[in-house]
């Protein structure tokens, strides 16, 4: 480690990736973050389903019991999809040469884009099995998802991973695990606020003020677009990750990152959902009208 005095905020010494260890059982903040995020989304969805006036034709798309049934589906799909995305998209050579690390989810290394694909597949299958409108299924899950994302980003900070570029800003943080011990952007916290808490408040406003659930697909479309934009902004401040070789060859020194590239399909999907929402003729007599 560099012994020079770091002109920035020292990483809090009391923050440890491990919460508690009891014999062979170790509880990590990272794993707990996923659990809390999923449980919050479940609780929030139940609250939203209790308000029929928010929904298309004043009819919630499913019962509270059904959303409870989906909790297990969501947990499995997010973890499996997120881990497979990390393994196959970000660092396949490392994981194939260290196969035991593939299941070490508690050490970090989850791809948001992989987790998104996993839960989209789970939502489609669950909605078809239970005769639920797919776009409404997307909406109810998207409404609470940003809080989970924000919590996990804070856990990334605790794990001292995905830190930012070196900076002279007064709020820069020196991470002990950084071999150069440079003052860096706490980009994990930027993402926690942009992808998590700010995006949650935007969705909260469009749900309760503009009754966005009535146009099915609107909330999920805004969520996906909002995440893609926030992620692309945060990529500017993130320290470069080891992108796939083919990508680095094509976009070397352009400032265009792999994370930005993966966000482009999300933008297209988000705009597609919004387009379908506003083309849906069944909502024409259901959306609230402004009074003059």
Swiss-Prot record:
Provide the binding site for a 1,2-diacyl-sn-glycero-3-phospho-(1'-sn-glycerol): 153
| GO cellular component entries | plasma membrane
Describe which pathway this protein belongs to, using the record's wording.
Answer: Protein modification; lipoprotein biosynthesis (diacylglyceryl transfer)
Q: How does it sit in the membrane?
A: Multi-pass membrane protein
Q: Where in the cell is it found?
A: Cell inner membrane
Query: Which Cys residues form disulphide pairs?
Result: none
Q: Which GO terms describe its biological process?
A: lipoprotein biosynthetic process
- What are the protein's GO molecular function terms? phosphatidylglycerol-prolipoprotein diacylglyceryl transferase activity
InterPro entries on file: Lgt
Residues passing through the membrane, by range:
25-45, 70-90, 102-122, 138-158, 193-213, 217-237, 255-275
Q: What is its EC number?
A: 2.5.1.145
Q: Which UniProt keywords apply?
A: Cell inner membrane, Cell membrane, Membrane, Transferase, Transmembrane, Transmembrane helix
Q: What does this protein do?
A: Catalyzes the transfer of the diacylglyceryl group from phosphatidylglycerol to the sulfhydryl group of the N-terminal cysteine of a prolipoprotein, the first step in the formation of mature lipoproteins.
Q: PANTHER family given for it?
A: PHOSPHATIDYLGLYCEROL--PROLIPOPROTEIN DIACYLGLYCERYL TRANSFERASE, PROLIPOPROTEIN DIACYLGLYCERYL TRANSFERASE
**Name of the protein in its database record:** Phosphatidylglycerol--prolipoprotein diacylglyceryl transferase
